[in-house]
Amino acid sequence: MKKKVLVGMSGGVDSSVAAYLLKQQGYDVIGATMQIWQHDEEFEEREGGCCSLSAVDDARRVCDKLDIPFYVLNFRDYFKEKVIDKFVQEYIDGKTPNPCIECNKHLKFDELLRRARGIGADYVATGHYAKIEKRDDRYLLIRSDDDRKDQTYALYNFTQDQLEHTLMPCGDYEKTKIREIAKEIGLAVHNKKDSEEICFISDNNHGKYISEAEPNRVKPGNFVDKSGNILGKHKGIVYYTIGQRKGLGLSLGRPVFVTNINAKTNEVVLGSEDDIFKTELIATDVNFIPFDKLEKEIEVTAKIRYSARPAEATLIPLPNGRVKVIFKEKQRAITKGQSVVFYDDEIVVGGGIIESII
């Protein structure tokens, strides 16, 4: 009997080809798009977001072409609770969150897997660029063959059970090959551009989005230097992130960068570029994949943001499941709320949320 797989379809080329590849491999494939959009006309009219209305239409057409069933699953309330509300609160708290990581953790590989099991599916699958392998008695998450498109940074929260029941067929290919396959089999999405912005923010202006969502909690305040001297006025801490230089609206006769955001005092601290280079951080909400718990100090490479190159670092276990990360070389703009992800060569060791910078 064929193994059944529920493929999360975004309407893009990657998940479309993932569904095709799995059908070719002999799986009983079902396509599904997570309905996450809110009751918002601008949101619903938006083109190209990963789960927008146009994405649903694209996904449905792909499933028709591949001759597989297609469903739209209502994740609206769950997405708001687990992703949007947390995103807004984190910015109000002076942090810079990564909503894609939360979506992967709570929706795509947790709730979607539960829904898949509810219809008798053995697996969920996505178009992510990453690989899953079983070595000895442990499932591992491995970097994609396409280094530029590798998405493991956003996938470090996997449990062993989730890895055992997840398929990622695009991880064995480069993006150019995925587009070639889509064109060869006649998929109209073969040249659809990649979605890079936050899917639920139509103009990619997160500050405006949060100000409209919580108008009473976003207030102007002071730009200050590290000694507390007032340098000017800011329009609300949600508009800024560590390392930011542009868009400050200040003319001080020298380049200044955001070095800290203090939610308690509603202040944005500015300093020189040297001030944003640090070597140590504390991470919380940590998950490890090759082992359950960090028992001793280990050497890894680590990324502090999606676009960063992995840098040599030491992991030191701390109480309450937290870890200290010490980089060999200073890192630019380590940011609270972002994730730090650990690697052993191509293997994802794990990751966590940056809680503080030392």
Curated annotation (Swiss-Prot):
InterPro entries: MnmA-like, MnmA-like_C, MnmA-like_central, MnmA-like_central_sf, Rossmann-like_a/b/a_fold. Keywords: ATP-binding, Cytoplasm, Disulfide bond, Nucleotide-binding, RNA-binding, Transferase, tRNA processing, tRNA-binding. The active site is at 103 (nucleophile), 199 (cysteine persulfide intermediate). GO terms for cellular component: cytoplasm. Pfam families: tRNA_Me_trans, tRNA_Me_trans_C, tRNA_Me_trans_M. It is an enzyme of class 2 (transferase). Its EC number is 2.8.1.13. GO terms for molecular function: ATP binding; tRNA binding; tRNA-uridine 2-sulfurtransferase activity. Disulfide bonds join 103-199. It comes from the Bacteria. This is tRNA-specific 2-thiouridylase MnmA. It comes from Clostridium beijerinckii (strain ATCC 51743 / NCIMB 8052) (Clostridium acetobutylicum). The gene is mnmA.
